[in-house]
Regions:
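A transmembrane-helix-recognition feature enriched in membrane-embedded lipid enzymes
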Residues: 1-40
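Residue-level signal for inorganic ion chemistry
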Residues: 15, 55, 104, 137, ...
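Walker A (P-loop) phosphate-binding motif
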Residues: 24-90, 191
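Hydrophobic residues at beta-strand termini and immediately following loops
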Residues: 44, 74, 154, 216, ...
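Short, polar loop motifs at secondary-structure junctions
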Residues: 76-79, 138-141, 248-250, 291-297
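Short, flexible loop segments at boundaries between secondary-structure elements
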Residues: 270-274, 305-331
Length: 331
């Protein structure tokens, strides 16, 4: 980056800091009210733009709490072609409610999924639907709602304390915004992350005395699934496959397939990409492996051998986190 661009980015980042800091001060001083509700609300979000594992975290919480609560997930529905409040139904798709909400709706039939840019209104509508616990997707900066428990995520390979405000970096607000979180989860860690490395990160993150620091990993399945069949990836060793992704960071998925011996041709599209028939013609000639999120958009297109690779969100010391959340939301 040349000197002139650095100066421009620095000035823009300073302006961004002044705006976001002023807004946060208004909430901190109570000059703008944050609303609470008579049912527990759990917020999942991050300080940085881009993928930190919010979707796997939401799905983890759904699996853990839906057996005991009528769970509702509320998202703004990023890049949807609709407006206002929508309670997901069989008439909806990724275009009408957004990629992640449609994935939740498709996978979990025992919960309510809704989208609304105005979270306060969306929560009220979900309460009328009989929801007992609400999960807010990507809502750390949405201070109009004060959650019962706030989870802040940060990517292991791009931790927020090493980042800068936009546009110089990827932060949506100052690093000190992390103090609003009840816990911090470092995501996408190596499965075998050492205690020494955990201690190193803890010293740098410096969680407050009221905050717990957790570490999580993405575990990739050794099986791929279509609408009506599955395959063991080991069967595809030394075979050519087309990997199709429209996510922020597909490196882990690509590495997993190559480590298993697949010959991978990677078609990498922007996050939340809406696939065209002309795109499909480029990669439908081989077995196609994609993410769960992309599968929801590709499954109705003309692709004979389309499979998705599931992932599991593994939190180290997850029972401690679940006990902490359960204690906070027990009314």
């Amino acid at each position: 980056m040349n000197l002139l661009k650095k100066i421009i980015y620095w000035k823009l980042s300073l302006q961004f800091f002044l705006i976001t800091n002023f807004r946060n001060k208004l909430y901190d001083l109570g000059l703008i009210k944050s609303h609470t509700f008579n049912i527990p609300v759990i917020s999942v979000g991050n300080l940085a733009v881009g993928g930190t594992g919010k979707t796997p975290m939401i799905e983890f919480l759904i699996r853990k709490f839906s057996p005991n609560y009528n769970v509702g997930v509320l998202s703004r529905g990023y890049k949807r072609n609709s407006k206002g409040f929508i309670l997901a139904s069989d008439l909806d798709d990724a275009k009408s409610i957004g990629d992640e909400p449609f994935q939740y709706f498709t996978k979990f039939k025992n919960i309510k999924v809704a989208v609304d840019k105005k979270r306060k209104r969306g929560i009220k509508r979900l309460i009328k639907e009989g929801v007992e616990l609400i999960l807010l997707d990507d809502a750390f900066q949405h201070r109009r709602v004060k959650p019962e428990y706030s989870i802040l995520l940060s990517d292991y390979e791009n931790l927020y304390y090493e980042d800068y405000l936009m546009p110089r970096g990827k932060l949506r607000e100052s690093k000190k915004g992390a103090r609003r979180a009840n816990c911090i989860v470092v995501t996408k860690c190596p499965e075998d992350i050492s205690n020494v490395e955990k201690d190193r990160i803890k010293k740098l993150v410096k969680p407050k005395e009221y905050q717990q620091l957790y570490f999580s990993s993405i575990v990739y399945s050794d099986k791929i699934f279509s609408l009506n069949s599955s395959k063991n990836l080991i069967q595809l060793k030394d075979k050519k496959v087309n990997l199709v992704t429209g996510v922020v960071n597909p490196k882990g998925l690509l590495r997993h397939l190559k480590d298993l011996g697949l010959i991978v041709n990677h078609f990498n599209y922007p996050d939340h990409y809406n696939y065209l028939n002309s795109d499909v013609q480029n990669f439908a000639d081989q077995i196609v492996i994609t993410t769960e999120k992309d599968f929801t958009k590709l499954r109705n297109m003309d692709i004979e051998n389309l499979f998705y690779l599931p992932i599991e969100f593994k939190i180290h010391n997850q029972e401690d986190l679940l006990a902490e959340i359960a204690n906070r939301i027990a009314y």
